[in-house]
């Protein structure tokens, strides 16, 4: 899979990761993780769902940055 979007933020010993990757013949693999735990993981075949997920990721990343999280 090749990454379309990837962002990892850290605060102290905590880590949050967001990723969208192209999944050949399936569509896109979307995942959100907190430390080692999977918060959400989905496969999408519709790019519009991926776009909505990217908007949500960007809102969440902005909120985390306001809370003091920084790029890893």
Question: Which residues does each PLM region occupy?
Answer:
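Short N-terminal "domain-start" leader segments
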Residues: 1-28
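Short, surface-exposed linear segments at secondary-structure transitions and domain or protein termini
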Residues: 26-30, 48-57
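A short, exposed loop/beta-hairpin motif centered on an aromatic-Gly-Thr core
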Residues: 35-52
């Amino acid at each position: 899979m090749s990454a379309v979007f990837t962002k990892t933020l850290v605060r102290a010993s905590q880590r949050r990761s967001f990723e969208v990757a192209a999944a050949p013949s399936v569509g896109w693999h979307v995942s959100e993780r907190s430390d080692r735990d999977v918060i959400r993981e989905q496969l999408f075949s519709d790019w519009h769902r991926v776009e909505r997920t990217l908007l949500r990721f960007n809102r969440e990343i902005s909120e985390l940055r306001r809370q003091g999280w920084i790029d890893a």
